[in-house]
Amino acid sequence: MQQHLTPWMVESAYRYLKAAKHLKCGHDMLDIAQINAAVGMEILLKSFVSKPNGKLGQADETYELDYGAIKVAHDHLRTVGKIPAYRKDRPPNKHDLLTLFYAIPEPIRVRIRLDRHEHWIEKDREVFTNSRYRYENGAPKGYDDILVGVLDELIDEVVAWYREQGCRDLFIVCYGMPPLERWPDRD
């Protein structure tokens, strides 16, 4: 299982999810919502292949990627023919959602129910890198909100798993709690 928990990354992914949910309700903003969900998904997946590298245990803890795990995942995908032709002879793409998916140990993927979303992760594996600028030649002409829903489900599962691991991070502990009601001012 994962040696180091990275709750700040989970919180960051959640923030991108919240932005995506707001954006998908805006006029002509679905593409931007999808990109925000892709960034959130990238951060969430990277949270499982990262380890703290500074300010351990503090609110502003920093992390570094395990490039070894990403390379192993990339090599596996190349072996099974799931690396796009234009990337075959290039180093691993640390933004590729499918590579990040396979960098996560399988028992964790199963526990957080990530495995059931592999199809959507593969479909949207390059949304962030290939869809940021819709005016570019080759940019997708259609968008959807599926990744928003997948990220929403996964954050719930990841937070539950972090709680099982005994994580005491404030975001993890308070996640899902209703906001406190303010009492009316007494005049």
List each language-model region with its residue ranges:
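Long, charged low-complexity segments
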Residues: 1-8, 18, 53-187
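Non-catalytic amphipathic alpha-helical adaptor/oligomerization segments
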Residues: 9, 35, 43, 57-58
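A long, hydrophobic alpha-helical segment
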Residues: 13-31
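Short, hydrophobic, well-ordered secondary-structure elements
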Residues: 20, 30-52
